[in-house]
Amino acid sequence: MNKYEIIGIVGEGAYGVVYKAKCKETGDFGKLVRSFIFLVAIKKFKESDDDEIAKKTIMREVKMLRLLKYKNIVMLKEAFKRKGRLYLVFEYVEKNLLEVLEDNAVGIDPKRLRYFIYQIIKGVTFCHKNYVVHRDIKPENLLINPKDN
């Protein structure tokens, strides 16, 4: 955790908290240089040493994320354990599809919507080719970068 500076909380879920952070080593915000991302999302899991089911679920997620390297799937940068808790560091993506939909109360342009659907299908197809089923596809879990990817 020493190389990251927490900026704020992105969200909370059943297994833990997701933080927005910047990499201290770069001293920069949000610029992409040769696939190294300075802004990251850090998923901090609740203590799970007592809960065998939670541990198995978390380890399955880590294994799956290490396997799934694809442009339409958020990238896992690293995973580490500190003080009995697991941390997953992802590329940071600013918005999700739910936020995009809420920002466009009159609806999304059909061409843009087709582009979103096409990318979702590409990502899901890649998962299925790797024998992974998402099981929780919903607008807030579909991340959208500034280029609509």
Predicted features and spans:
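A short, aromatic-enriched beta-strand patch in the conserved N-lobe beta-sheet
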Residues: E78-A79
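Conserved short submotifs of the Hanks-type protein kinase catalytic core
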Residues: G84-N96
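Conserved N-lobe beta3->alphaC-helix segment of eukaryotic protein kinase catalytic domains
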Residues: F29-V40, K44-K69
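Catalytic-loop of the protein kinase fold
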Residues: H128-N145
